[in-house]
């Protein structure tokens, strides 16, 4: 007789283990599972655990050469989703040995790899991940983190202000640098390359880097404040990306930028290591995130992408506005904003946080609020995001009727007014509009901005 029982397997026999005690070293995942009609929850949950770890669809001879018990993923808990009939949350525990140290790429290849195309499931969404301390410690994380960034920039006690240079495509390098200078001169801390500005025929990267560096040094000299421009180093190859980062370092600028999802985690981690070694801050843009996180029942929630970025490395990351033109529910957004900034985050399902996460002193990331925001939003943004954030007004700066510099002045005056009001104990949520109106009496630039964008 054959030494093992051949044939197609019932996953739940091996991979559904409701009495399993999770280990401190396990990576834990919460999946929202929508099985095909007729597939029981236990089988679907077990299938997810199997397909994203050691399983294959049939019993194989080589299973006998290893210890499945040591290496298999386990579905250890299943709970129904309130208000959804055929949907539930499956909790899966993965032994740490399944993952390469310091590789977000490998972690995702396993956990969100082939399993998302699995036939027995109608849809699958990864809602949250618990990264164990032992695995966190294998990552460098953000190049510098929030405190070091404040020290480098000498800016304390308030959110930082940025602006994306528009029109995003079509300006020459010289005119682009001119727009950068105007914004920084007016009072912003940062300006930003748009995520799709890489190195195109109308503006090659080296020319842009040069003119932007000139603009920020001129603005720095005139304002006495440290200025930055996020130079987008994203490129078609890792070598080209590093070449751009090297040139930024040679120019002596404080910060570069990367599109971490389109560029990929391998490239991102490479750049993050370079940035720490060379004293550059790293701004991260999340272009492509909505492809992955927009669907409610398939894909990955952004909080998982945010956690992955903190491991891979970045000092700023775009994370929605709660107000403005891009969607984002307040509690949920604040949940992953805290995951980015804090050292320790408690499990709290009302904020979408399925697991308690301890970052064991990995530096924090500044959340960036960007997209359709303007001066009237300033009180709400200051209240929601607090000091440790970057508020980015693209059109909200460049759309000012008098030009970029006055637009920058309006934003800076509005921000300083909100911070001062908050420090005096006023309630930004209820008195916000009044605070902006009072400030606009002393600032014609702000008054003009208040006219253009109605409260």
Curated annotation (Swiss-Prot):
Chain positions found as N6-carboxylysine: 192
The family this protein is said to belong to: Belongs to the RuBisCO large chain family. Type I subfamily.
Protein's name in the database: Ribulose bisphosphate carboxylase large chain
Record-annotated active site: 166 (proton acceptor), 285 (proton acceptor)
Lyase listed as a keyword: yes
Record SUPFAM superfamilies: RuBisCo, C-terminal domain (SSF51649), RuBisCO, large subunit, small (N-terminal) domain (SSF54966)
Keywords: Calvin cycle, Carbon dioxide fixation, Chloroplast, Disulfide bond, Lyase, Magnesium, Metal-binding, Methylation, Monooxygenase, Oxidoreductase, Photorespiration, Photosynthesis, Plastid
Other comments on record: The basic functional RuBisCO is composed of a large chain homodimer in a 'head-to-tail' conformation. In form I RuBisCO this homodimer is arranged in a barrel-like tetramer with the small subunits forming a tetrameric 'cap' on each end of the 'barrel'.
Keyword rRNA processing set for record: no
Cellular component GO terms held in the UniProt record: chloroplast
Catalytic activity of the protein: 2 (2R)-3-phosphoglycerate + 2 H(+) = D-ribulose 1,5-bisphosphate + CO2 + H2O; D-ribulose 1,5-bisphosphate + O2 = 2-phosphoglycolate + (2R)-3-phosphoglycerate + 2 H(+)
Recorded name of the encoding gene: rbcL
Any one GO molecular function term: monooxygenase activity
Enzyme Commission number, as recorded: 4.1.1.39
Species the sequence originates in: Lupinus cosentinii
Domain of life, source organism: Eukaryota
